[in-house]
């Protein structure tokens, strides 16, 4: 097999956020898949070991990927390579040549010329979009070219076609690529804030409403993954304005962002608490508890929205009210999930089972009367 070693930009905070010390060692830290059970937290050895599906990777390990199969392996770092680490983040030499140095040099030269030929820029970027989704190449593009791509997105005189291609490249690089996410969050902590404001400004100025909605979706698709593990400072007013865009996809993306921010606030660290400069908790409680009832949502979106709503209600209690039909929806979901848990004979997806339990328990403990929880769930407690 052909293994390619990766340079990882792993921030200690992001990696530690994936491990809950309060549940470490419990049954929730075991994954069962394909007839095999193994720890959720990957334990590295001196030799290369395979990272199994769903395992969390501690920071600071050497990692390599089989480019033909996508399988990952990790090991403890070699001592003489430890000098490459600073503050838990591997140093990336973004000035070195790589596969696309020549192409991006052409783009950079046009931008710096004072009278750029954007047809040249468009051709180069269009040829590069397909490579950005590659795990290794996407990381190289982000670490070498992110500053340039930012300039193209934020430039006032840059054509929308160039902004679009720059956005598509970043979206492709970030998709399912944790090293890219960690690199951007660590090196460019204000990027999310500026991008949301760019989305608002573009929406105001655009003359083509359809084109504007499409580009706003791209910007939000960049923001979404950057907030999964790493809370960022956010201007809530920008999100409020974007939520007014008459597009269901845009509105769902805004709610997913808000849900992740509120979920992050529940960890009680300073960065999470500053993620929202001001917060209209009642409005977002209403919108989240209304949107989660949609029949068109998949399980992933239901979980994401619910975690944010759960965090909101836990933090603010009776000070916030859910949408009038939410408690009825929650009661139906609770009964359906309890029934599924009693009927399932085969081992279930751990993450789904964990979420089902959270939803069931929260019906009375968080969203209703805690005194009713034990009575209503005597049978469930014995599962």
From Swiss-Prot:
One of its GO terms (molecular function) is adenyl-nucleotide exchange factor activity. Residues 1-17 form the signal peptide. Keywords: Endoplasmic reticulum, Protein transport, Signal, Translocation, Transport. GO terms for biological process: SRP-dependent cotranslational protein targeting to membrane, translocation. It holds the Pfam family SIL1. InterPro entries: ARM-like (IPR011989), Sil1_fungi (IPR031884). GO terms for cellular component: endoplasmic reticulum; endoplasmic reticulum lumen. The keyword Secreted does not apply. A motif (Prevents secretion from ER) lies at residues 380-383. It is found in: Endoplasmic reticulum lumen. Interacts with KAR2. Belongs to the SIL1 family. Required for protein translocation and folding in the endoplasmic reticulum (ER). Functions as a nucleotide exchange factor for the ER lumenal chaperone KAR2. This is Nucleotide exchange factor SIL1. It comes from Eremothecium gossypii (strain ATCC 10895 / CBS 109.51 / FGSC 9923 / NRRL Y-1056). The gene is SIL1.
């Amino acid at each position: 097999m052909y293994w390619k070693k990766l340079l990882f930009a792993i921030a200690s905070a992001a990696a530690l956020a994936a491990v809950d010390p309060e549940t470490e060692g419990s049954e929730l830290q075991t994954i069962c898949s394909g007839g095999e059970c193994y720890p959720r937290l990957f334990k590295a050895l001196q030799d290369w070991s395979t990272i199994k599906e769903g395992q969390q990777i501690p920071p600071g390990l050497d990692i390599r990927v089989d480019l033909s199969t996508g399988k990952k392996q990790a090991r403890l770092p070699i001592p003489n390579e430890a000098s490459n680490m600073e503050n838990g983040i591997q140093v990336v030499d973004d000035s070195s040549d790589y596969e696309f140095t020549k192409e991006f040099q052409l783009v950079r030269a046009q931008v710096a010329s004072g009278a750029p030929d954007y047809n040249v820029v468009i051709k180069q970027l269009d040829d590069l979009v397909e490579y950005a989704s590659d795990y290794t190449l996407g990381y190289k593009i982000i670490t070498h070219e992110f500053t340039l791509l930012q300039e193209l997105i934020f430039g006032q005189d840059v054509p929308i076609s160039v902004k679009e291609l720059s956005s598509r490249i970043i979206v492709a690089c970030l998709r399912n690529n944790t090293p890219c996410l960690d690199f951007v969050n660590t090196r460019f902590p204000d990027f999310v804030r500026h991008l949301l404001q760019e989305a608002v400004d573009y929406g105001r100025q655009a003359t083509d409403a359809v084109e504007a909605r499409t580009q706003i979706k791209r910007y939000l698709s960049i923001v979404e993954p950057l907030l999964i593990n790493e809370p960022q400072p956010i201007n809530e007013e920008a999100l409020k304005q974007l939520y007014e865009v008459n597009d269901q996809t845009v509105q769902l993306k805004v709610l997913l962002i808000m849900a992740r921010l509120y979920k992050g606030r529940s960890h009680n660290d300073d960065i999470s608490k500053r993620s929202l400069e001001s917060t209209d908790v009642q409005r977002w409680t209403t919108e989240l508890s209304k949107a989660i009832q949609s029949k068109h949502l998949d399980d992933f979106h239901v979980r994401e929205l619910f975690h944010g709503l759960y965090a909101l209600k836990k933090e603010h209690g009776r000070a916030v009210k859910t949408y009038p039909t939410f408690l009825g929806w929650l009661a139906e979901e609770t009964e359906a999930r309890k029934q599924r848990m009693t009927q399932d004979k085969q081992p279930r997806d751990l993450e789904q089972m964990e979420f089902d339990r959270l939803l069931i328990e929260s019906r009375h403990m968080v969203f209703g009367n805690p005194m009713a929880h034990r009575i209503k769930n005597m049978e469930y407690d014995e599962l």
